[in-house]
Each structure stands twice: as C-alpha cells, then as structure tokens.
C-alpha cells in the first residue's frame, strides 16, 4: 500500500479528531456547576479536572512508544472506545469523589488518542507540509471545541443534564467507527528515516535543539493551561457577568472558531519559515488577551478577548508542532508526540489546580492574574527558540 501524502488523504484523520473533540467538549459550559452540585469546592474541582491530565502525564509517553512498536491504529481504537463508554458513567455518578476515578479512566483513554492521532498525521505529511498538516489538525480540534460547548450548553439549558452526556457517547462511537473503517495503519517505512541507525543509537532530539524542544513544548503547555482555565473557571467567570450556559457556549464558539481558522492560515505561514516569530507573537497576543479579561464587562468585550486568545494559539501552535517534527526522530515519532502532548497535559493539570486554589483564595480575578503571569513567562521563554532552516529528520 503506497504512503499517502496529499492533504485529502488525511481528511478522515481530521474528521475523526473533530468528532471526538465535539463529544467531550459538549459538557464544558456546565461541568464545573455539575461537579460543585455534587459537593465539590473550587479546589476539589481543580483536582477533579486535573486528574484527567495527570494520568496522561504518566501514560502518554509509554503509550506513544507502544504505538511505535505495535502500530498506531489499534492503540487509537482502544482510546476512542473509552470515549463512547465513559460519558455514561457521569450520568450515574453520585459523589464528587467518584468523578476522580471516572476522570482518571478518561485520561488513560485520551493518552491513546491525541498523541497517536498527531503521529499518524505527521507520518503521512511531507516535511515541507508539516506546518499546514498540524494547522489542519488543530483547526479540526478547535472548530469542534467551538461548536461542542454551544451545542452542549443549549442541550443543558433546554433538555437537562443527561442529554449532553448521551450525545458525547454517540459521537465517541462515531469517531471509533470512522477510524476503524477509513484510516489505515501506515507502512513501517513511512515512519522510518530511510537508512537510519537503530532506535537505540538514534537521538530523539537533533543536537543543539534541546532548548528549542523545551520552548516549543511550553507553547502547547500554555494551550493546555488555557484549556484548563476554560474548563474550570470560564463558567464561573461568565456567571459573574450574568451569562448563562448558552452564553458560555457562544464564547467557546468564538474562541474555538478563531483558533481553528488561524491554525489553518498560520500553519501555512509556518511552512514558509519564520516559525520563531509566529510562536513569540502568538504567545504575546495570548498573554495580552488574558491580562485584559478583568477589564471586560460585557459579552462583546469578552468574546473579542477570547477571539484574540484563539488567534494567539492559532499562530503559535502549528509552528511549534512543525518545528518539533523538523528537529526530532521520525522513527520515534509516537514517543516524540507523546512527550509533546505530555507538555500540553501538564498545562491541563497545572491550569485547573492554579484556577481552583487561587479562586478559593482570591476569587476569579486572582485566577486570571496568575494565568497572565504564567503566559508572560512562557512568552519570554520562546525567545530562546533556535529556528531550523530545514528539517533535520524527514
């Protein structure tokens, strides 16, 4: 079977990502209220949200390595199977403590989905098209993140708590079937570097690019932090301004839509060079947008700021992902993107913990200030990136 390299061949991959994200994002507008109705404090809420990422921190790298050895598709299918079963567990949960177990299982399933999906896409994208490929991946992810909360918020407001969870299970099953029927396991040669040394002698990161790898990973850590803030604190922040669950869904729509559109555009720009400039500018825009949130007092202002935040992520993320691919081993790509996604999930762990602890101590505005400081620190770190003129590993 020939290796597929055109963007059209990746359409089923992007569609599977879109459907999977659409499912789990349905509950975003009301999840904090759902958890706190079961007796959780803000701090407990932070732990419940964070355990999802914490499990991924522990499992993404070994699962990525396993996919390098056993094949990507079967691992991906196992992960997607959890997306169709676990949503039903939330309906019958009767305590906040039980959610820790459910979220932990969800994190294990997600470890078998996101890094493997990224590796499958990079396997089949030409070196000169990696920025565009990752831009489309992120666009699929964030366009679903834009629509899911709006749909979920409307279902919650009009049909009650259970409806979004049932739809999540249905969408998880649909993504599973799509991968099973439409996505093929890539040939081994499509993920190997021609006549390369064995894995034992092959460096994971090209010499001289370790700091660059760290800085690029910090970019997706920031994306995870933003996701953690949104999932933990956005509904409370919005409630303080008098917004309902549907309004929160609209904010997600603007944020996710902006992120998706700019991922496509700036993913193409990243393939033309200047990845470092895109990464720095995107992180700076995100920091400025976050810093202005305490000044917002209406729906229009809030949505504009979240659009700016989405634009910043859309500029920085595909460039960082492409630069990672350019400077790391192709034959160990599952492991590479396991590490890369572990950085993102570090943000998903850190974000809710910071949000919960600072909200209990200083309120929602205290959380926003803490997130702004973290965004500034990551922006400064991106100045250390060393740009590669050509892919070190194809």
Regions found by a protein language model. Give the residues of each.
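Helix-breaking motifs and short loop linkers at transmembrane-helix boundaries and internal kinks
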Residues: 39, 71, 92-97, 109, ...
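Juxtamembrane intracellular "pre-TM" segments in multi-pass secondary transporters
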Residues: 1-7, 184-216
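Cytoplasmic helix-loop-helix junction between adjacent transmembrane helices
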Residues: 102-141
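Core transmembrane helices of Major Facilitator Superfamily
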Residues: 24, 105-117, 308-320
């Amino acid at each position: 079977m020939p290796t597929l390299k055109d963007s059209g061949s990746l359409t089923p991959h992007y569609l599977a990502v879109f459907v999977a994200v659409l499912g789990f994002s349905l509950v975003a507008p009301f999840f904090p209220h759902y958890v706190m109705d079961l007796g959780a404090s803000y701090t407990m809420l932070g732990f419940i949200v964070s355990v999802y990422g914490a499990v991924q921190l522990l499992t993404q790298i070994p699962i990525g390595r396993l996919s390098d050895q056993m094949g990507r598709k079967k691992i991906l299918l196992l992960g997607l199977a959890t997306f169709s079963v676990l949503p039903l567990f939330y309906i019958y949960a009767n305590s906040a403590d039980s959610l820790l177990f459910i979220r932990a299982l969800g994190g294990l399933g997600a470890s078998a989905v996101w890094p493997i999906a990224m590796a499958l896409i990079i396997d089949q994208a030409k070196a000169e098209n990696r920025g565009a490929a990752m831009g489309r991946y992120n666009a699929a992810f964030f366009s679903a993140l834009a629509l899911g909360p709006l749909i979920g918020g409307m279902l919650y407001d009009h049909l009650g708590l259970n409806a979004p969870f049932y739809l999540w299970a249905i969408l998880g099953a649909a993504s599973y079937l799509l991968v099973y029927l439409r996505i093929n396991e890539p040939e081994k040669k499509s993920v190997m570097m021609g006549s390369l040394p064995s894995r034992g002698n092959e460096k994971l990161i090209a010499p001289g690019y370790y700091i660059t790898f760290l800085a690029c990973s910090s970019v997706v850590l920031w994306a995870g932090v933003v996701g953690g803030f949104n999932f933990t604190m956005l509904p409370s922040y919005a409630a303080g301004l008098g917004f309902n669950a549907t309004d929160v869904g609209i904010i997600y729509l603007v944020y996710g839509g902006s992120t998706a559109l700019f991922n496509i555009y700036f993913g193409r720009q990243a393939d033309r060079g200047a990845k470092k400039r895109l990464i720095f500018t995107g992180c700076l825009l995100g920091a400025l947008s976050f810093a202005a949130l305490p000044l917002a007092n209406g729906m229009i202002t809030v949505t504009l700021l979240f659009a700016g935040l989405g634009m910043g992520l859309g500029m920085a993320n595909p460039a960082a992902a492409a630069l990672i691919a350019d400077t790391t081993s192709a034959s160990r790509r599952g492991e590479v993107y396991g590490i890369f996604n572990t950085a993102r999930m570090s943000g998903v762990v850190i974000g809710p913990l910071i949000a919960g602890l600072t909200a209990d101590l200083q309120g929602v505005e205290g959380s926003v200030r803490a997130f702004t400081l973290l965004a500034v620190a990551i922006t400064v770190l991106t100045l250390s990136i060393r740009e590669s003129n050509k892919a070190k590993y194809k």
